[in-house]
């Protein structure tokens, strides 16, 4: 390693190297949540461009490429698209579950009435669009796609808020994140229950046994994350064979992840004081007492963080900048035609997102506050909430995912067009309204009271 001799880190900081100038900037880039929305948008544009170009047939065929393994009588063969949708997306759902667990135990969702505000608003944002969709598609071939209009895309919503900067009303970001988390959890359950095949109970029982084993390993104090990932992969195979959509495994494992660190802050302090008690010098190598103490300190520092925090920090960049763009490339490609846009399924999807979402979120949130069931977050005006409610019409990722489970061929193409069109309209409408209203809109607040 080449160290920058001219660089003098401040006391308590790590020494710097020449490569840090590049890697630190890149790490900061990955930490910006809004950036993932921009990358996702870029992948979507690429998919749409290639799907409507002379290379469209080759682009679509790429995602149907069969990939798998065979060991004796065991054979696992899936298309590249299925591996992304069923396999890699499990990591996405795992991250979503980690966020849910963290928010409920450590974050904004600890306050029951604050939780109620997000849950009630999310319920309206799911029930009203679903009801509107079913009203338009009752008795039609697209009726089975009622789950498409339920979710909200967190990355795109946060990306939109980032464009507004300081104009975003206080509390709106937390509210939309909480609402999106509830939306995603409900959408995951819809996929698992509403869009699964006939169930193989033996395979499902094997998956349940695997979950019990993972719980047992946690109680015994097994700390190696690789062991849990291996066990999770085996459970995924069992649940996938059962007929239930295997992405539910990611949710269950995420919710099972502990939120407390193994090493307490007090114990960490004691271990570090022991390391610091040794005299300075080049004596930290070899099988010596001070070297062993240093290794223990390294483990203690890592284990002070909870598994939820460690896994989220480790996996989030891979999911945001790897899994999600791949998902968009594999699923957002759609042939843009006037016939597809005026298809009844496309129109029903657009109505559900563009009209149903904001109406449902706003109306249910208002009812929750009026009945005393929930409290509105401090600093969140009703004008800001309406603008945010319009942004919840950006369904994209989860909507495309559910559409892939509910539809095939031409109907799927129409549903994708509806999702994309609704996402564009909702983002423009939401951003416009949030720009029009100041942070504190007393007039609209008074009207709602």
Swiss-Prot record:
Its main location: membrane. GO terms for cellular component: plasma membrane. GO terms for molecular function: sodium:proton antiporter activity. Pfam families: Na_H_antiport_1. It is a multi-pass membrane protein. It comes from the Bacteria. One of its GO terms (biological process) is regulation of pH. It is found in: Cell inner membrane. It catalyses: Na(+)(in) + 2 H(+)(out) = Na(+)(out) + 2 H(+)(in). The chain crosses the membrane at residues 32-52, 87-107, 114-134, 145-165, 174-194, 202-222, 233-253, 318-338, 347-367, 382-402, 417-437. Keywords: Antiport, Cell inner membrane, Cell membrane, Ion transport, Membrane, Plasmid, Sodium, Sodium transport, Transmembrane, Transmembrane helix, Transport. Na(+)/H(+) antiporter that extrudes sodium in exchange for external protons. This is Na(+)/H(+) antiporter NhaA 1. The lineage of its organism: Bacteria, Pseudomonadati, Pseudomonadota, Alphaproteobacteria, Acetobacterales.
């Amino acid at each position: 390693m080449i160290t920058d001799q001219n660089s003098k880190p401040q006391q308590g900081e790590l020494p710097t190297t020449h490569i840090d100038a590049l890697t630190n900037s890149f790490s900061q880039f990955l930490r910006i949540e809004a950036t993932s929305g921009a990358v996702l948008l870029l992948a979507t544009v690429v998919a749409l461009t290639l799907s409507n170009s002379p290379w469209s047939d080759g682009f679509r065929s790429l995602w149907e490429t069969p990939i798998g393994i065979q060991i004796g009588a065991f054979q696992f063969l899936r298309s590249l698209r299925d591996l992304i949708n069923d396999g890699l997306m499990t990591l996405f759902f795992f991250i979503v579950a980690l966020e849910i667990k963290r928010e409920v135990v450590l974050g904004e969702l600890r306050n029951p009435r604050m939780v109620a505000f997000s849950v009630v608003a999310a319920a309206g944002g799911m029930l009203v669009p679903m009801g509107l969709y079913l009203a338009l598609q009752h008795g039609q071939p697209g009726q089975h796609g009622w789950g498409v209009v339920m979710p909200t895309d967190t990355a795109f919503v946060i990306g939109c808020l980032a464009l507004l900067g300081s104009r975003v009303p206080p509390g709106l970001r937390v509210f939309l994140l909480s609402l999106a988390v509830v939306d995603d959890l409900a959408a995951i359950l819809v996929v698992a229950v509403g869009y699964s095949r006939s169930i193989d109970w033996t395979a499902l029982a094997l998956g349940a046994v695997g979950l019990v084993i993972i719980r047992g390993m946690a109680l015994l104090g097994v700390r190696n994350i690789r062991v849990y990932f291996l066990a999770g992969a085996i459970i995924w195979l069992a649940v996938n064979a059962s007929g239930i959509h295997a992405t539910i495994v990611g949710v269950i494992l995420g919710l099972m992840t502990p939120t407390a660190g193994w090493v307490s802050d007090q114990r960490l302090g004691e271990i570090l004081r022991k390391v610091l008690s040794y005299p300075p010098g080049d004596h930290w190598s070899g099988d010596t007492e001070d070297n062993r103490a240093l290794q223990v300190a390294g483990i203690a520092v890592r284990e002070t963080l909870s598994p939820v925090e460690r896994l989220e920090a480790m996996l989030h960049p891979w999911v945001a900048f790897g899994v999600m763009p791949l998902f968009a490339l594999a699923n957002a490609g759609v042939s843009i035609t006037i016939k597809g846009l005026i298809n009844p399924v496309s129109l029903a999807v657009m109505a559900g997102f563009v009209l149903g979402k904001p109406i449902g979120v706003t109306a249910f949130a208002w009812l929750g506050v009026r009945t005393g069931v929930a409290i509105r977050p401090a600093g969140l005006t009703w004008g800001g909430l309406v603008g945010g409610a319009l942004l919840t019409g950006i369904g994209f990722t989860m909507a495309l995912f559910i559409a892939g489970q509910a539809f095939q061929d031409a109907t799927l193409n129409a549903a994708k067009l509806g999702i994309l069109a609704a996402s564009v309209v909702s983002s423009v409408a939401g951003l416009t309204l949030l720009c029009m209203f100041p942070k504190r809109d007393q007039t609209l607040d008074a009207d709602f009271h």
